[in-house]
């Protein structure tokens, strides 16, 4: 797979808490130059990006990030504001405590509530695989499918681990046919980029892809 094809799968990501406007502009400029699938950035920058770049960049942001503890009502409010400001894609974090309490129906209903707000735009559901058992991961595949979300996403990049090939294979067995997969966290080499795409991931969340494909040493999400 050539570099251009890889980058079409990349959500070019900058979610570090110290991100400046200059950092954000660099991500936007790179996304335009290299035709990445989207930029994934903090919600506080959406309106400024939209005012500066218009439709030249596809804006993705995060909701309930990174711990997922916000109430459903809070996540809905975040989502509505993000969409109003110009976001086209929402990456939400589930309430992991609900999963641990086996309140799977509650998780499903929260995802469904956010998908109703997102409508025909894209909703990705971060399940933070590093904290879940195999049984819980399978339950979340079912929840994401039943709730009508567009993607299941492995990780925030802020947990104790990121995407693994084993989790991608597990997802493929248990998600519905309309659900796509996003790998994030630990996508840190060119080999990783190719491996996850070849395994069936439609999106990759990483801050490193552009640098890696340019042959640069990079650090980040």
Swiss-Prot record:
Catalyzes a reversible aldol reaction between acetaldehyde and D-glyceraldehyde 3-phosphate to generate 2-deoxy-D-ribose 5-phosphate. NCBIfam families: deoC (TIGR00126). GO terms for biological process: 2-deoxyribose 1-phosphate catabolic process; carbohydrate catabolic process; deoxyribonucleotide catabolic process. Pathway: Carbohydrate degradation; 2-deoxy-D-ribose 1-phosphate degradation; D-glyceraldehyde 3-phosphate and acetaldehyde from 2-deoxy-alpha-D-ribose 1-phosphate: step 2/2. This is Deoxyribose-phosphate aldolase. The keyword Lyase applies. Belongs to the DeoC/FbaB aldolase family. DeoC type 1 subfamily. The keyword Cytoplasm applies. The gene is deoC. It comes from Clostridium botulinum (strain Eklund 17B / Type B). It comes from the Bacteria. It is found in: Cytoplasm. It is an enzyme of class 4 (lyase). GO terms for cellular component: cytoplasm. HAMAP family: DeoC_type1.
């Amino acid at each position: 797979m050539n570099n251009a094809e890889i980058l079409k799968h990349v959500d070019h990501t900058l979610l570090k808490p110290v991100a400046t406007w200059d950092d954000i502009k660099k991500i936007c400029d790179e996304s335009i130059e290299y035709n990445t699938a989207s930029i994934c950035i903090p919600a506080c920058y959406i309106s400024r990006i939209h005012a500066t770049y218009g439709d030249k960049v596809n804006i993705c942001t995060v909701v309930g990030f990174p711990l997922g503890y916000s109430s459903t009502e809070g996540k809905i409010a975040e989502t509505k504001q993000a969409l109003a400001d110009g976001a086209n894609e929402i990456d939400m974090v589930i309430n992991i405590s609900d999963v641990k309490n086996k309140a799977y129906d509650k998780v499903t209903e929260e995802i469904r509530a956010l998908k109703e707000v997102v409508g025909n735009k894209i909703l990705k559901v971060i399940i933070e695989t590093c904290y879940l058992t195999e049984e819980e991961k399978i339950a979340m595949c079912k929840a994401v499918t039943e709730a009508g979300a567009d993607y299941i996403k492995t990780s925030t990049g802020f947990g104790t681990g990121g995407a693994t090939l084993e989790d991608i294979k597990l997802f493929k067995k248990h998600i519905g046919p309309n659900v796509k997969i996003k790998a994030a966290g630990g996508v840190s080499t060119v080999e990783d980029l190719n491996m996850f795409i070849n395994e069936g991931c439609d999106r990759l969340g990483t801050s490193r892809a552009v640098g890696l494909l340019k042959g640069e040493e990079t650090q980040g999400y």
